[in-house]
Amino acid sequence: MLTHRVEPVYPPLARQIHKEGQVELRAIIATDGTIQSLQVVSGDALFLNSAKDAVTQWRYRPTVLNGQPVEIETYITVIYTLQH
């Protein structure tokens, strides 16, 4: 469960050219709830750094298995839409 979310910054160039998009990331969440590893699965290059910068700051409640926190893999989609 996500306990702390940092919103990604909309990249200025993408905003200027009215571009929307999304980034899919593969994340390893460590036993302490931090993002241990982050890989880009897909997404427009304009949004990659912004998505990674935000998601690396996210914090999760650790997943517990048999009473012990465990590392898990998950996929995260960050969507960029302009307000109309």
How does the language model describe each region?
Residues M1-H84:
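Charge-biased low-complexity segments
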